Amino acid sequence: MKSFIFRQNPRKQQQEQNNLVDYSDSDDDEECNDDIFVNNEIIINVSEKSSKDYGLFIWDGSLVLSWYLFTLTKNNPQFWNGKNVLELNAGVALPSILLSKLGVNKIIITDRIDGFIEIQNNIIDNLNLNGFNINNNNNINDNKIFIEPLSWGNFEKFSNQLTSSSIDYLITSDCFYDNTKNYDDIFATWYYFLLKNDKLVILLTYQVRCNEKTIFNYLKKWKLKSEILSIKDISIPNYNIDSEIILIKITKNQ
């Protein structure tokens, strides 16, 4: 059993000088429930599965991205209201669940076609844990949340929901690995949505794993504008952010 609790509770800060993060591990449990306290009002429950599929775990990049998305509401609590958001490579979909709580107009949660059913079922479980009524027919909360298969560069298999929706923000975390064969497929997918909306903002958390092959040359190749965003002010209580995680904002050159 592994569990962690993130608290950011202003009313308790005077009583508790330190926020609590609990970590425990046990090989006996096939499933663990993580309670992530995003602020005083939002509690997110996430279930991880013991599986060979890496898409069923919470990764550091997903945590960093989630907390950054939350910080955007610090000065404007309505920041996400009316926005349409697409999450690629979602895994357990922590950022999407958070955004659903923060008032997005529509969230489309996607992951690869290969192994999609298992990932989809885990996402459905997590959405249900957080009070969203969802079933396998994607009949979810008045067409607010959708779960769709999407493999990088496989445009002919994009669902109607993907091809017809106007996306304001595209978010993704930890999609580049040492064994990622073709970075161009990822960039082609981003570019597809940038062509549909040239004001689209892509937010990416990227963990440097291979110094010989980084995304920055590809950003130049695809002529995309990028900005490294500071994560020093992202406050994940008592959580040590991996120094190799980079948060990048990507837009289309105008």
Swiss-Prot record:
Gene Ontology cellular-component terms listed: cytoplasm; nucleus
Signal peptide: none
Gene3D superfamilies: Vaccinia Virus protein VP39
GO biological processes: methylation
GO molecular function: protein methyltransferase activity
Region (Disordered): 1-27
Record EC number: 2.1.1.-
Pfam families registered for this protein in UniProt: Methyltransf_16
UniProt KW keywords: Methyltransferase, S-adenosyl-L-methionine, Transferase
Compositional bias segments (type: Polar residues): 11-21
Keyword Disulfide bond: no
Keyword Lipid metabolism in record: no
Family of this protein: Belongs to the methyltransferase superfamily. METTL23 family.
Reported function: Probable methyltransferase.
Protein name (database record): Methyltransferase-like protein 23
Species the sequence originates in: Dictyostelium discoideum (Social amoeba)
